[in-house]
């Protein structure tokens, strides 16, 4: 029983295998009825523990692409080749039945405090469930009771308006905020996790409505600002600043650091819960992810000025462009001086493991975790920095941004990274061109989101809500290469690391020879020099802001209707 509870507490894998056997022996599902269950706190906890399996997988969190990461393995969202499927994992409803089953019979628990707490847990997860559904499909059926196969509701109910469903989501989150515990726990949902989720949900919905021409966006942004401000003022969470590389430590730490992290997926070798972030970031066969040049350019100089205001920035090589930058740059990608955890040797970017030359190190632990599926560092789901950024953006979108908001949100994030934290007076032209807006504060907030939340699964949603899906079609650029057939030192240790060529590989010891042009995945922007290009066909269209309803669901219930552009 204890092993089962620990397993589910981590919220990182579906209930199964030997870790569930004790629990299933004690509470066989064929005898789990409303009359004999949900009477005690242990029973309520045991049942609701399974809800934690709804959280995104590790690869979904760190494996994002959007317009920030290039890799060889791409999702249909990025490729733009999604068609109307027969079925879809994102249209599954089983977890909703489990949640509603609990809420229907939780009154069996006579202890009101316990009952309300676990109803808060269930409603937190129902809000999470429906937020994901609305992001993917827009209008969806709202169901607040358990339904089984054969229930007429399955065949007759159409989709409810997005507005109605989102109001229900907010009602669930408000209930969770009121009834969940205030004590910190990175592995269990709390009041602070509910406020952080409400902050995320309301920012998404408010800005999606604003940039997609829907009404009532102001009320959602006001709700975001209110929830975020309460979190900032009352939760006690803050930006983690310990050590010389606090940003990197926040993600490479084996155990979630609860100074800043509100909710995390836990991993534990002892009970077989592991992921593969080390392999993903270092292997030559797992997609070869690399930061894109357009995002690398967004990292500021330490004095707070844009990198793109430096003379000659367009043709700087990696060692030069890494100097005097926002500390998060060197804590996100390999730059001169980088050493693996528990190693004293300098590690240059490996072009066989990264498509762009900007090899990622966020989350990366020591080399002993490099083998397949061996990583055990916890992965953050909600953290204080995101809530701060949500607050800043909501206030900016509402026209209520000022120095006080800047100082409570953007300044501490930049100062942790060793960047001068003053609020800029003029808009950065590079950002204006990239995002197509002129507001200086809004641009700086978008800069911070791109940098601070990179590889945390937020970027695709950001582009969708800002109505910037076309960014997924842009050319992918990597590091600048001055010339072909010339070996380069990428990490400044005096030893050459890489050479780009159209001919045969050379034989200089320690140099990786990268073929460009012809049938290679690579080319150079100006044929013989320039930014590294990685080209793959992508086709984002307006209809891809929402997914199509699966055909099987429409066959069963035509009243669901298909999303407009997918008809």
What residues fall within each predicted segment?
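C-terminal motif of bacterial Sec signal peptides marking the signal peptidase cleavage site
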Residues: 16-19
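Short coil/turn linking the two alpha-helices of tandem helical-hairpin repeats
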Residues: 134-135, 141, 184, 204-213, ...
């Amino acid at each position: 029983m204890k092993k089962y509870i620990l397993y589910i507490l981590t919220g990182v894998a579906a209930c199964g295998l030997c870790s569930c056997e004790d629990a299933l022996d004690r509470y066989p599902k064929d005898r789990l009825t409303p009359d004999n269950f949900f009477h005690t706190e242990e029973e309520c906890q045991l049942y609701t523990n399974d809800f934690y399996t709804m959280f995104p997988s590790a690869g979904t969190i760190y494996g994002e692409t959007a317009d920030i990461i290039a890799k060889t393995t791409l999702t249909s969202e990025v490729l733009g080749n999604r068609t109307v499927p027969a079925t879809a994992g994102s249209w599954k409803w089983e977890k909703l039945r489990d949640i509603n089953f609990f809420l229907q019979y939780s009154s069996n628990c006579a202890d009101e405090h316990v009952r309300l707490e676990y109803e808060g847990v269930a409603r937190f997860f129902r809000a999470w469930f429906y937020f994901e559904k609305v992001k993917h499909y827009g209008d969806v059926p709202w169901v607040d009771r358990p339904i089984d196969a054969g229930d007429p509701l399955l065949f007759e109910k159409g989709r409810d308006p997005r507005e109605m469903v989102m109001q229900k989501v907010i009602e669930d989150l408000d209930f969770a905020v009121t009834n969940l515990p205030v004590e910190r726990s990175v592995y269990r949902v709390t009041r602070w996790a509910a406020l952080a989720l409400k902050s995320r949900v309301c920012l998404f919905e408010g800005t999606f409505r604003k940039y997609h021409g829907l009404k009532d966006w102001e009320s959602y942004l006001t709700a975001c600002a209110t929830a975020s401000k309460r979190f900032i003022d009352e939760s006690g969470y803050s930006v983690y600043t310990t050590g010389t590389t606090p940003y990197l430590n926040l993600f490479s730490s084996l155990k979630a650091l609860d100074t800043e992290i509100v909710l995390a997926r836990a991993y534990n070798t002892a009970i077989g819960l592991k992921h593969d972030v080390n392999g993903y970031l270092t292997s030559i066969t797992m997609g070869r992810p690399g930061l894109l040049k357009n995002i690398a350019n967004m990292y500021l100089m330490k004095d707070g000025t844009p990198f793109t205001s430096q003379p000659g920035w367009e043709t700087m090589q990696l060692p030069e462009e890494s100097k005097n930058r926002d500390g998060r740059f060197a804590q996100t990608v390999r730059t001169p001086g980088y050493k693996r955890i528990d190693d004293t040797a300098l590690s240059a970017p490996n072009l066989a493991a990264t498509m762009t030359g900007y090899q990622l190190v966020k989350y990366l632990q020591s080399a002993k975790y490099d083998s397949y599926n061996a990583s055990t560092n916890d992965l953050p789901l909600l953290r204080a920095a995101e809530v701060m950024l949500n607050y800043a953006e909501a206030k900016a979108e509402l026209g209520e941004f000022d120095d006080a908001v800047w100082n409570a949100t953007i300044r501490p994030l930049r100062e942790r990274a060793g960047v001068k934290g003053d609020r800029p007076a003029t808009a950065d032209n590079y950002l204006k061109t990239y995002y197509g807006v002129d507001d200086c504060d809004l641009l700086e907030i978008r800069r911070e989101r791109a940098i601070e939340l990179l590889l945390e699964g937020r970027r695709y949603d950001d582009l969708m809500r800002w109505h910037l899906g076309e960014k997924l079609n842009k050319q992918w650029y990597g590091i600048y290469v001055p010339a072909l057939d010339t070996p380069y030192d990428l990490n400044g240790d005096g030893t050459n690391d890489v050479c780009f060529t159209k001919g045969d590989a050379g034989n200089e010891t320690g140099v990786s020879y990268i073929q460009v042009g012809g049938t290679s995945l690579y080319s150079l922007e100006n044929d013989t020099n320039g930014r590294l290009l990685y080209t793959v066909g992508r086709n984002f269209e307006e209809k891809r802001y929402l997914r199509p309803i699966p055909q099987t669901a429409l066959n069963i219930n035509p009243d669901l209707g298909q999303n407009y552009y997918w008809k």
